[in-house]
Amino acid sequence: KKDGYPVEYDRAY
């Protein structure tokens, strides 16, 4: 996960 991405991206990243 990276700062700047929404929570939905937290699962993909």
UniProtKB/Swiss-Prot annotation:
Keyword Secreted carried by entry: yes
Expression (tissue specificity): Expressed by the venom gland.
UniProt keyword list: G-protein coupled acetylcholine receptor impairing toxin, G-protein coupled receptor impairing toxin, Hypotensive agent, Metalloenzyme inhibitor, Metalloprotease inhibitor, Protease inhibitor, Secreted, Toxin
Source domain of life: Eukaryota
Major site of localization recorded for this protein: secreted
GO molecular function, one term: peptidase inhibitor activity
GO cellular component: extracellular region
Subcellular locations according to the entry: Secreted
GO biological process assignments: regulation of blood pressure
Function: Acts as a bradykinin-potentiating peptide (BPP). Induces endothelium-dependent vasodilation that is reverted by NO synthase inhibitor, suggesting it activates molecular targets on vascular endothelium leading to NO production and vasodilation. It appears to induce vasodilation through muscarinic acetylcholine receptor (AChR) M2 (CHRM2). Does not inhibit the angiotensin-converting enzyme (ACE). Does not act via bradykinin B2 receptor.
Protein family membership: Belongs to the non-disulfide-bridged peptide (NDBP) superfamily. Scorpion BPP (group 1) family.
Protein name from the UniProt record: Bradykinin-potentiating peptide T
Organism for this UniProt entry: Tityus serrulatus (Brazilian scorpion)
